[in-house]
C-alpha cells in the first residue's frame, strides 16, 4: 500500500460532530505512521424550506427552516497496513456519513 492514497469524505449536519470525527481519524492515522493532508473543509450546503403555517388563506404566514450539511475531506498519503486496520476498527459517531476511496 505504499503508492496508494486513501481519501475520506465526511458529511454531517452537526459541525461539532464532524470536527470530532475528523480529529479522531487524524490522530489514528498519525499514530500508525501515515502522513495526513487535511482536514479540508468543503462548502456547506444550505437547504431552505418554506412552509405555509395557515391551512387555507394568509399567504404571508410562513415558517422557514434550514438544514446545513457540513463536509470535510481527508487524504491519507502512504498508508501502512496498520493504518488501514486501525481505521477499520475506529468507531465514529452515528450522525457522520463516511465515504472512503482508494486512489
Curated annotation (Swiss-Prot):
Checking Pfam families in the record gives: Ribosomal_S10
One GO biological-process annotation of the entry reads:
translation
**SMART domains tied to this protein:** Ribosomal_S10
GO CC, sorted alphabetically, is: ribonucleoprotein complex; ribosome
Kindly state which keywords UniProt assigns to this record, in alphabetical order: Ribonucleoprotein, Ribosomal protein
Task: Report which superkingdom the organism of origin falls in.
Answer: Bacteria
* Entry-linked SUPFAM superfamilies: Ribosomal protein S10
Q: Which GO terms describe its molecular function?
A: structural constituent of ribosome; tRNA binding
Q: Please report which protein family the annotation says this sequence is part of.
A: Belongs to the universal ribosomal protein uS10 family.
Subunit structure, briefly? Part of the 30S ribosomal subunit.
- What function does the entry list? Involved in the binding of tRNA to the ribosomes.
Its protein name is: Small ribosomal subunit protein uS10
Name the species this protein comes from: Pseudomonas paraeruginosa (strain DSM 24068 / PA7)
Amino acid at each position: 500500500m505504499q503508492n496508494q492514497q486513501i481519501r475520506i469524505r465526511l458529511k454531517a449536519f452537526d459541525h461539532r460532530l464532524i470536527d470530532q470525527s475528523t480529529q479522531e481519524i487524524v490522530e489514528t492515522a498519525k499514530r500508525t505512521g501515515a502522513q495526513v493532508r487535511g482536514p479540508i473543509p468543503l462548502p456547506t450546503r444550505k437547504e431552505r424550506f418554506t412552509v405555509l403555517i395557515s391551512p387555507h388563506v394568509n399567504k404571508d404566514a410562513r415558517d422557514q427552516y434550514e438544514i446545513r450539511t457540513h463536509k470535510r475531506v481527508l487524504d491519507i498519503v502512504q498508508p501502512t497496513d496498520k493504518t488501514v486496520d486501525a481505521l477499520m476498527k475506529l468507531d465514529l459517531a452515528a450522525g457522520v456519513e463516511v465515504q472512503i476511496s482508494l486512489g
